[in-house]
């Protein structure tokens, strides 16, 4: 008997009307060829094959897909998984995996759709699918003013209808701050109303005298105290700001906010640039001497500090310069804090326009190289780079002897002397450097000589008022002496005239005397004749 292997099924002809299963799954209705069978198609009878011969191991037959409209079912975009999750009885009690500490921190978007979290969580961007969209809880919006103050920061929380409860929890602090602000404004308005009503009570009292005045003052004090208690720290900050504003308006020295500097104030304007060297302490002596010579009514001094010079300048010295000597001190950061928009003044341009003379003392090798090459990477070098050549610049080098005597330094000094005639380099001194005991050139010029050179550049030493008064008194004395001499001469002339008159009288008397003598002689002759 032949085995199953020997039995071969006859080759079945390929049906032309058979459609692939992939196409059947795509189309919504069966093709017309299935609904309208063609009569020309001949069906060949197939021989009966034993069932055992068709059961070929390893081949699984897939069930036939139904294409009828009645059996079709609408499935959501989430698929069967979402449907099972929605139909499961414990889906309402299901907790997101993000809230369970034992599980992974990641949570699928389906969990967000079914059970959105009560606490706000950060999403980089919402899902592109409509049914996966989770509306984020927005934080309170603040309006920030240009000055950075919090006066206009009225909280306007934005909440979504789905997450109203979490947003209310998040905005609890904002609501408290709003309530405190409202209480403060109400107390201030009530205090203002009471202050306005008290003068009316005093006027209506008529001749109440001192009692009515005392009552009004007491009510004012109580309302002011309540207003201060309600305001709290806000009142403290406002009072400090007002005090700072009043102090800045009194004197010339103020905080480095507005770089617009007065130019036509009738004073000499001296700008001092300070670099990082041990001779920084001499700047205080130079400032004191200049103020002693000219007084603060005739001279105004401002200082520019480089980044390295701040390491050598003591806080006590800086405090004395700013608060006692009323010297405004600028740093590199002020270049950007004073300039915010295009129309704001530029600090290094304002300093260049303000200054009558610039002194760089002490001058390091680093800043010397920047000046010679035109590098401007800080506030001081920006001022020098934009300097008006009609005004002088004095440089007082202070460096090591080997640095000063190097060929690079000589070349830079020669370049400045040839191409920048408005810059004068003061010759350094020979001194002992550091603890090594080296003696060489490179020490900064004596500060008295620097002061003398500044005074000469500004037009010379001013005359003292005492000397002027002494000179005026001497002139007055000399004039009075000259006037007295003139009076004496006039008196002498009068005396001479009197003498001349006396002489004339004598001459007249002499002329009248001879006739009398003749008459007497005639009388004597007559007497003799009578005898």
Curated annotation (Swiss-Prot):
Enumerate the UniProt keywords alphabetically: Cytoplasm, Nucleus
Keyword Cytoplasm appears in the UniProt entry? yes
Subcellular localization(s) per the UniProt record: Nucleus; Cytoplasm
A GO molecular function assigned to this protein is:
FMN binding
Q: Composition bias, kind Gly residues: at what positions? A: 204-213
According to its UniProt record, where is this protein mainly located? nucleus
- Bias (Low complexity) occurs at 183-198, 214-249
- Bias regions of kind Acidic residues — which residues? 462-472, 481-514
Regions of biased composition (Basic and acidic residues) lie at 1-20
Question: Where is this chain compositionally biased, Polar residues type?
Answer: 155-168
Gene Ontology CC entries for this record: nucleus; phosphopantothenoylcysteine decarboxylase complex
Q: Where is this region: Disordered?
A: 1-42, 88-127, 139-168, 180-261, 461-531
Q: Family assignment? A: Belongs to the HFCD (homooligomeric flavin containing Cys decarboxylase) superfamily.
Q: What does this protein do?
A: May stimulate expression of certain genes that are periodically expressed during late G1. Also modulates the expression of the ENA1 ATPase.
Q: What is this protein called?
A: Protein SIS2
The answer to whether keyword Cytoplasm applies is: yes
């Amino acid at each position: 008997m032949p085995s199953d292997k020997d039995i071969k099924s006859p080759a079945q002809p390929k049906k032309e009307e058979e459609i692939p299963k992939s196409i059947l799954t795509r189309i919504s209705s069966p093709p017309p060829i299935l609904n309208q069978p063609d009569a020309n198609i001949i069906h060949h009878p197939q021989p009966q094959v034993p069932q055992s011969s068709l059961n070929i191991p390893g081949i699984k037959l897939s069930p036939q897909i139904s294409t009828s409209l009645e059996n079709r079912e609408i499935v959501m975009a989430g698929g069967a998984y979402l449907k099972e999750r929605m139909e499961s009885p414990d889906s309402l009690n299901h907790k997101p995996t993000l809230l369970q500490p034992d599980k992974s921190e990641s949570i699928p978007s389906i969990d967000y759709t079914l059970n959105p979290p009560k606490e706000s969580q950060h999403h980089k961007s919402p899902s592109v699918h409509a049914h996966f969209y989770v509306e984020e809880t927005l934080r309170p919006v603040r309006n920030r003013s240009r000055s950075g103050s919090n006066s206009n920061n009225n909280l306007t929380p934005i909440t979504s209808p789905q997450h109203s409860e979490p947003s209310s929890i998040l905005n609890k602090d904002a609501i408290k701050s709003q309530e405190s602000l409202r209480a403060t404004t109400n107390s201030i308005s009530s205090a203002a109303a009471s202050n306005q009503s008290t003068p009316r009570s005093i006027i209506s009292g008529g001749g109440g005298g001192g009692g009515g005045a005392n009552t009004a003052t007491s009510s004012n004090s109580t309302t002011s105290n309540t207003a201060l208690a309600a305001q709290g720290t806000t009142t403290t900050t406002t009072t400090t700001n007002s005090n700072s504003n009043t102090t800045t308006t009194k004197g010339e020295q103020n905080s480095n906010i507005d770089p617009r500097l007065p130019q036509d104030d009738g004073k000499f304007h001296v700008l001092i640039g300070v670099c990082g060297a041990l001779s920084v302490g001499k700047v205080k002596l130079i400032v004191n001497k200049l103020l002693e010579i000219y007084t603060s009514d005739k001279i105004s001094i401002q200082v520019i500090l480089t980044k390295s010079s701040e390491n050598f300048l003591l806080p006590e010295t800086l405090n004395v310069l700013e608060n006692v000597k009323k010297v405004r001190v600028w740093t590199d950061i002020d270049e950007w804090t004073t300039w915010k928009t295009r129309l704001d003044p530029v600090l290094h341009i304002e300093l260049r326009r303000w200054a009558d003379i610039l002194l760089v003392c002490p001058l390091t090798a680093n800043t010397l190289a920047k000046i010679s090459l035109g590098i401007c990477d800080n506030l001081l070098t920006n001022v020098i780079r934009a300097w008006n050549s009609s005004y002088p610049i004095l440089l007082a080098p202070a460096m090591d002897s080997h640095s000063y005597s190097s060929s690079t330094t000589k070349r830079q000094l020669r370049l400045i002397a040839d191409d920048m005639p408005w810059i004068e380099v003061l010759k350094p001194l020979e001194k002992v450097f550091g603890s090594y005991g080296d003696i060489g050139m490179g020490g900064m010029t004596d500060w008295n000589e620097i002061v003398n050179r500044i005074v000469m550049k500004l037009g010379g030493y001013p005359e003292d008022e005492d000397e002027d008064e002494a000179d005026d008194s001497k002139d007055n004395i000399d004039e009075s002496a000259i006037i007295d001499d003139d009076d004496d001469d006039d008196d002498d002339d009068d005396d001479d005239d009197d003498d001349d008159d006396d002489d004339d009288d004598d001459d007249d008397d002499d002329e009248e005397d001879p006739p009398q003598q003749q008459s007497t002689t005639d009388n004597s002759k007559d007497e003799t004749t009578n005898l």
